[in-house]
Regions:
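Glycine-rich ThDP/TPP pyrophosphate-binding loop and its adjacent helix/strand module
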Residues: 1-127
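Thiamine diphosphate
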Residues: 42, 119-166
Length: 166
């Protein structure tokens, strides 16, 4: 059995809801997964997208072992309470949320999605949808040829036309 396509990102923020992770967890995650014959990679800065991308690319090259990528992050980065359990599972609050956004160079007070992000998402979603739709149509047309009666029943059900013979 080969799990070379399995890549897991592990968020190593060292914080739990109750406080520092060290209060309740002493396991060395890296050594544990290495002992289980996983490829273990580490990203030193979870805010470095390029470093994460490189680790994922390296993980994809491994053909036989699963890959664990330990991503070292600071929970609540940019918040006054970053790195603490005070930002774990609790809202930041308006002012602290604004400060966290500013630390990322994002100067919008309210919830906001930049137009270029929205357009990119829309374009990719439409492309993926068309591809899936075309695959479905091809598959359904093949099904119709082999099972015309059942295909008609499915088409009727999709159209909201039900005929029950009980």
């Amino acid at each position: 059995l080969s799990l070379g396509k399995l890549i897991v990102l592990y968020d190593a923020n060292k914080v739990t809801l109750d406080g520092p992770l060290s209060m309740s967890f002493s396991e060395n995650v890296k050594k544990r997964y290495e002992a289980c014959n996983w490829q273990v990679l580490e990203v030193k800065d979870g805010n470095d997208i390029n470093e994460i991308h490189k680790a994922i690319k390296k993980g994809k090259k491994e053909q036989f072992k699963p890959t664990l990528i330990i991503v070292n992050t600071v929970i609540g980065f940019g918040s006054a309470n970053q790195g603490t359990n005070k930002v774990h599972g609790a809202p930041l609050g308006k002012e602290d949320g604004k400060n966290a956004k500013l630390s990322y160079g994002f100067d919008h007070d309210e919830f906001y999605v930049p137009e270029e992000v929205y357009e990119d998402f829309k374009k990719k979603t439409i492309k993926r949808g068309k591809s899936k739709f075309n695959k479905w149509n091809k598959l359904f047309n093949e099904y119709k040829e082999q099972y015309p009666t059942e295909a008609k029943q499915l088409e009727d059900a999709i159209a909201g036309k039900y005929s029950l013979n009980i």
